[in-house]
Amino acid sequence: MTLDGNGFERAIVKHCSPTLVGIKPACLFNVPGDFAQHEKQQSTGEQDRSRQAPGTRGASGQSTGKQDPSRLRNARLDALVARANRQLAGTSVHVRVLARRSCGALVLVYRPQLLARELSAPRAAATMFSWGYETTGSGWLEAAIAHLGRKLENRQRCSANGGFPHEVGLFLGYPYDDVMAFIEHEGRDYLCCGCWKVYSDQESAEACFARYKRCTRDCEAMLGRGATLAELTSMTVAA
């Protein structure tokens, strides 16, 4: 995808339509590019600039000050996220950058009330707490989302193939039993695979996958006809 307004809107609709219309608590998509915060490089660059007299130019006669490409890329992404949130104001749908990594930025589109309901269910809350997440108190949901983002960034720093922590499935509204069975079976021996790997109630899961596909198809068609993100949130999708 391209980092422009239209491209970002299309990505939201392509990957997050079920959340836009309210049948899924959250969706996640990746924006390709290097969005990692290169602290050492930035620090070194700032030290070099501080040692250089104002207005000093290099041997070529050009200014030696350089813009960090990842910083510019992050600024552009932040502007697009802010624009999307303005478009979605009053709809109960929020957009935020979940994690900034060298292999791409993960953008979370979510409905706070639906997501809080999912994560505060007794079994999910107990499991999340055992994994180090806040599950109660003022601001617990935003704290949990921020904690997930840090884990995703740290995993990518430690390994280029760091993968996703298992609790991502709970944030995305996957059935609790399927998330835990995925962990137990190490991703093997599933009944079917769609948005997630299914270990129980295959019929219900397949119906859900089909509904998500219809939702995405209809939302993409409406976007193509000029509908706004806010207008898509009022759509209804047959069960």
Mark where each language-model region is.
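Short, flexible, solvent-exposed loop/turn segments with mixed acidic/basic and small polar residues
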Residues: H15-V21, V95-A99, K151-S159
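Intrinsically disordered, low-complexity terminal tails and inter-domain linkers enriched
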Residues: Q37-L72, R157-A160
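Long, compositionally biased
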Residues: C195-A239
